Structure formats: structure tokens, C-alpha cells
Regions:
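Glycine-rich FAD pyrophosphate-binding loop
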Residues: 21-41
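Conserved FAD/dinucleotide-binding core of flavoprotein oxidoreductases
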Residues: 84-100, 104-109, 185-259
Length: 377
């Protein structure tokens, strides 16, 4: 039986742990540095069908129905008014029990960890990693040690374990924007479609709103281009950058606000150990403009599990090359979206809106731009 150590109890780490748990050839232990698993209960996520299909392998299709939502469209709006530019029918990519899904991150985490409680050890932070004859020895700050055959690192964008493995201080880079999120409880006068995804494109900013369950709760995320500052007056920033463009948006930001600087990965790393692998944000963190963060975490976990279970030769290189190819595909689209969502020149905005009307109805374009991502696995 092979021993597998998984560092980080996030989406990718918990998902691959579920896959290993269903295979008697592996013994898993999940380590997390926090005292409790971070649920981030107010945080909504989107899952495209490439990840929903994989989650169904661990019975996500039986997930409590009122705690998730299946939007059918993305509605595009400009900053000038509440009039819709066009919409994109994402349900065209759906099939049977595999549909574009939105939900709270905390609900997905609870689903992923419900059968793993006996395999999770919290308050474990790695201080040292050694290898001897293909066995990796982990030493934690509490002086506990653990020997494993495979080490899977999924402790997020600020992965401390990656720095220990590579023996260098590896940090993500600030991408020049700030993310703000809040939860909205829909009312009769809510100006947008509460059953679908709304994308409001502004000058140097954009807002995404989508339902996260069948209880009329919506997640709002606002991305604003902003130089890095340690202290920011959120209300003043929103008033200056958002409300100045459209006062109709004021009622969207009345609830509790949370914010964080957006970091992305400078470049992916191939682990120095042949039996150690990076997953999720520890491998690569995308700009949040393609809604593929969670889906790519799930996809990469399934990809790695498949390669390991098939005893693939030259495993490290095969996995890294597959992930690198996938990253480039998603990242190119994320960067293009980031640029096009934030246009400020009136002529460019007019041209973008015209193209959106055409492209969102072009089957050939959508199959290339989205289908290559949504339908890969």
C-alpha cells in the first residue's frame, strides 16, 4: 500500500483525497496548517461542466439540491445603463446530470470532507522535507514526522510547502487589481436577472453577480484595477471607481464587504522530487476572469490521480506538460477577458459590445473559446 501525504485541505486536496480513498492501494493523510478547515462561508464559486463531471464520480450528483444553482446564461451589461448588451447561453454545454453549477465554497468543502474527517490533521505546518530512496520524509513544526511514497502539495497560492521543496522563497505576484465580495439577498426591485450570471463591465473594473443556491442568495464579486496599498477605504474606493460610473449600482454594496488583493502565479514549477506534485493554486493561480479556479483545481487533481493509478512512466514530466498546456489555454483567455472587461476608451467599448453580440451567438467561436475548456474531460 502506497502512503500519500496531501498538504492543504482545500478543493484540490480534498477532491484527490476522495479519489484515493476509493482505491485500496493508497493510504492517505491530509495535513493543514490551520486549526480548523477554512470554509470562507460567504464565498461563492462557479463550476463549469469539466469539473462537475469529475465531481459526479464522488456522488456530487446527490449533493443537496437547494444548496446549489444551475444558471443557464451569462448576461452582459455596460456601465452606462442597466440595458443588457447580449447574453451567452452556457446551458448549451450542459448534459444530463452535468450542468454549469454555482454554490457556496463552504458547502462544496463540507461535501468534500464529510468522509475524510479521520484522515485530516490540522495545525500541521511543514518545516523540512527530505528524501531517501524515493521515500519522502516530512518534518513539521511540532517535530512530528511522516514518511510517504507520494507528496501532493495543494496549500494555495501562498504555498509555504512549495518554498520548502524548492528551497527558495516562491511568492505570487500582484496583478494590479483588488477583489471585493459581498452577499446579496434578492428583493423584488433587484435590477438584474437573479436566476443567471450578470457581468457588468466598467471602466477599469467589472462586477459579476450570480445565484449560489435556491434561497435567493447571490454572490457579488467586483474586480477593480488598483495599485497595491496596505490600507484601503473600501467605501471610498467603490464610490470613486464604481458609483461614479453608474449610481444604480449603489444598492448592490449595502451589505458586509470583504476584499483582498488579487495575486497570480509568475510561472509554474516542476517539483524537484519525482514523487512530489503541485495541485490547484499551488501549481498555478489564474486571474479571476474565466471562473476556472475551482474547476482547474478539480481537473488537475483527477488528472494526477489517473496518472498515479496507472503507474505512468516519467510521471512528473507527463503531469507537468499536461498541466502546462492546459494552463496556457485557460490563462490566455483569462488575460483577454481581463483586458476586454475593463476597457475605458468609448470607441473600444463600442467595438467590444458589437463583437460580443456577434460572438455570443457564434457556435463555432463558442466551441473554440469555451468548449475547449468546458468539455475537455
Amino acid at each position: 500500500m502506497k502512503k500519500v501525504a496531501i498538504i492543504g485541505a482545500g478543493i484540490s486536496g480534498l477532491f484527490i483525497a476522495n479519489l484515493f480513498k476509493r482505491n485500496s492501494n493508497y493510504q492517505i493523510t491530509i495535513y493543514d496548517k490551520n486549526k480548523t478547515i477554512n470554509l470562507e462561508s460567504g464565498y461563492g464559486i462557479q463550476l463549469s461542466i469539466n469539473s462537475v463531471k469529475l465531481l459526479n464520480k464522488i456522488e456530487f450528483n446527490r449533493f443537496q439540491n437547494d444548496k446549489k444553482f444551475n444558471p443557464k446564461k451569462i448576461n452582459f451589461y455596460s456601465h452606462k445603463s442597466l440595458n443588457k448588451i447580449c447574453d451567452l447561453d452556457i446551458s448549451d454545454f450542459n448534459y444530463e446530470d452535468c450542468k454549469y453549477t454555482t454554490l457556496k465554497r463552504s458547502d462544496l468543502i463540507n461535501f468534500l470532507k464529510k468522509d475524510l474527517e479521520n484522515h485530516i490533521k490540522t495545525s500541521h505546518n511543514i518545516s523540512k522535507i527530505d528524501q531517501d530512496n524515493q521515500i519522502i520524509r516530512l518534518t513539521f513544526e511540532n517535530n512530528e514526522t511522516f514518511d510517504c511514497d507520494y507528496l501532493i502539495i495543494s496549500d494555495g497560492v501562498f504555498s509555504n510547502t512549495k518554498s520548502v521543496v524548492e528551497n527558495e522563497n516562491i511568492q505570487p505576484i500582484y496583478n494590479g487589481s483588488l477583489a471585493i465580495r459581498t452577499l446579496i439577498k434578492t428583493t423584488q426591485d433587484f435590477p438584474y436577472d437573479k436566476k443567471n450570471i450578470s457581468l457588468i463591465m466598467l471602466k477599469n473594473a467589472h462586477i459579476v453577480i450570480y445565484p449560489i443556491n435556491k434561497k435567493d442568495e447571490l454572490n457579488l464579486v467586483c474586480i477593480i484595477r488598483q495599485k497595491f496599498l496596505k490600507k484601503i477605504d473600501l467605501n471610498l474606493l467603490i464610490k470613486k471607481e464604481i458609483f461614479s460610473q453608474n449610481k444604480n449600482l449603489e444598492n448592490l454594496f449595502g451589505n458586509h464587504l470583504e476584499s483582498w488583493p488579487v495575486y497570480v502565479t509568475k510561472k509554474p514549477h516542476r517539483s524537484v522530487y519525482e514523487n512530489s506534485f503541485y495541485l490547484g493554486d499551488a501549481f498555478y493561480t489564474f486571474s479571476p476572469t474565466m471562473a476556472q479556479g475551482a474547476s482547474q483545481s478539480i481537473e488537475s487533481a483527477y488528472e494526477l490521480f489517473n496518472l498515479l493509478s496507472k503507474d505512468t512512466k516519467d510521471l512528473q514530466n507527463v503531469y507537468f506538460k499536461k498541466r502546462l498546456e492546459r494552463i496556457r489555454l485557460v490563462n490566455n483567455r483569462s488575460r483577454l477577458n481581463y483586458y476586454s472587461f475593463h476597457l475605458s476608451n468609448p470607441l473600444m467599448v463600442t467595438a467590444r459590445n458589437f463583437l460580443l453580440k456577434k460572438l455570443t451567438k457564434s457556435e463555432k467561436f463558442l466551441n473554440s473559446y469555451l468548449g475547449n475548456i468546458y468539455q475537455r474531460i
